[in-house]
């Protein structure tokens, strides 16, 4: 096992513990608490994968951080903070929408890279909006917290979330997963739109009809799907 992988996990465990103390003292806001909960799931998954105890890793992580802080001068810390870009937290969804439980009548789940996609295949002929909470750096999506698909009535019919046991994903991972989710929903004649906020930070542009710009590969896939559907409809007639 790579020593850097272990030390990274140990430091992450300790920093999570520090952030938990901030929340316990009621100093954290809603996005801070949301990230804390999701990072806890991620750490549990990483600990299981690495075969490491989280409590023991937290103690070692504390020692690593304390050693770094002893060697770090105040001036160096100021320079580091000044040169490091800060990420922003973007919220399409309210806390209620983010934390609401939901169930599927005809569940389908698919893993696309480090992301898990869930779709209710029972949903048909609906207008659906994709909304997400995520962090942004350099005006580009950095980390997806959670994406959900909502009907006009407010029902949740789909979701994309990071896999706790597979930390880290790229903007391309997110866009590919969104393509899969849209394809699954449109298969049942649903009309899917993507929030302007998500379009802006994931694709760098927005589409008037609410659809994200498609790659040539996605366009070919959608064309094949459309031809297949037309053939099925003709056979049914």
Swiss-Prot record:
Domain of life of the organism encoding this protein: Viruses
Q: Which GO terms describe its molecular function?
A: protein serine/threonine kinase inhibitor activity; RNA binding
User: Where in this protein would one find the motif Nuclear localization signal, according to its record?
Assistant: 34-38
* Segments of this protein annotated with the region PABPN1-binding: 223-230
What Pfam families does the record point to? Answer: Flu_NS1
Task: Cite the record's Basic residues compositional bias ranges.
Answer: 217-237
Q: Where is this region: RNA-binding and homodimerization?
A: 1-73
Q: Which processes are annotated in GO (biological process)? A: symbiont-mediated suppression of host cytoplasmic pattern recognition receptor signaling pathway via inhibition of RIG-I activity; symbiont-mediated suppression of host gene expression; symbiont-mediated suppression of host mRNA processing; symbiont-mediated suppression of host PKR/eIFalpha signaling; symbiont-mediated suppression of host type I interferon-mediated signaling pathway
List the subcellular locations. Answer: Host nucleus; Host cytoplasm
Briefly state the modifications made to the protein after translation.
Answer: Upon interferon induction, ISGylated via host HERC5; this results in the impairment of NS1 interaction with RNA targets due to its inability to form homodimers and to interact with host EIF2AK2/PKR.
Keywords in alphabetical order, please.
Answer: Eukaryotic host gene expression shutoff by virus, Host cytoplasm, Host gene expression shutoff by virus, Host mRNA suppression by virus, Host nucleus, Host-virus interaction, Inhibition of host innate immune response by virus, Inhibition of host interferon signaling pathway by virus, Inhibition of host PKR by virus, Inhibition of host pre-mRNA processing by virus, Inhibition of host RIG-I by virus, Inhibition of host RLR pathway by virus, Interferon antiviral system evasion, RNA-binding, Ubl conjugation, Viral immunoevasion
Q: Where is this region: CPSF4-binding?
A: 180-215
**GO CC annotation: what is one?**
host cell cytoplasm
For this protein, the record's HAMAP family field holds:
INFV_NS1 (MF_04066)
Domain comment (free text): The dsRNA-binding region is required for suppression of RNA silencing.
Q: Subunit structure, per the record?
A: Homodimer. Interacts with host TRIM25 (via coiled coil); this interaction specifically inhibits TRIM25 multimerization and TRIM25-mediated RIGI CARD ubiquitination. Interacts with human EIF2AK2/PKR, CPSF4, IVNS1ABP and PABPN1.
Q: What does this protein do?
A: Inhibits post-transcriptional processing of cellular pre-mRNA, by binding and inhibiting two cellular proteins that are required for the 3'-end processing of cellular pre-mRNAs: the 30 kDa cleavage and polyadenylation specificity factor/CPSF4 and the poly(A)-binding protein 2/PABPN1. In turn, unprocessed 3' end pre-mRNAs accumulate in the host nucleus and are no longer exported to the cytoplasm. Cellular protein synthesis is thereby shut off very early after virus infection.
The name this protein carries in UniProt is Non-structural protein 1
Native species of this protein? Influenza A virus (strain A/Port Chalmers/1/1973 H3N2)
């Amino acid at each position: 096992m790579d020593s850097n992988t272990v030390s990274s996990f140990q430091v992450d465990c300790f920093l999570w513990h520090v952030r938990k103390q901030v929340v316990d003292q009621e100093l954290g806001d809603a996005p801070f608490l949301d990230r804390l909960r999701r990072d806890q799931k991620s750490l549990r998954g990483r600990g299981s994968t690495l075969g490491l105890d989280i409590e023991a890793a937290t103690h070692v992580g504390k020692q690593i951080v304390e050693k770094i802080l002893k060697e770090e001068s105040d001036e160096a810390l100021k320079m580091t903070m000044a040169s490091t870009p800060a990420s922003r937290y973007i919220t399409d969804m309210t806390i209620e929408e983010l934390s609401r439980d939901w169930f599927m009548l005809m569940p389908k789940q698919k893993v696309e890279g480090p992301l898990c996609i869930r779709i209710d295949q029972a949903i048909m002929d609906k207008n659906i909006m994709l909304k997400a909470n995520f962090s942004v750096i350099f005006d580009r999506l950095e980390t997806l917290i959670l994406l959900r698909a909502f009907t006009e009535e407010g029902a949740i019919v789909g979701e994309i979330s990071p896999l706790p046991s597979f930390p880290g994903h790229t903007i391309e991972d997110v866009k590919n997963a969104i393509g899969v989710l849209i394809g699954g929903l449109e298969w049942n004649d649903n009309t899917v739109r993507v929030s302007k906020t998500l379009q802006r930070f994931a694709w760098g542009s927005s589409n008037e009809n609410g659809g994200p710009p498609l790659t040539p590969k996605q366009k070919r896939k959608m064309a094949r799907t459309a031809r297949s559907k037309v053939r099925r409809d003709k056979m049914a007639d």
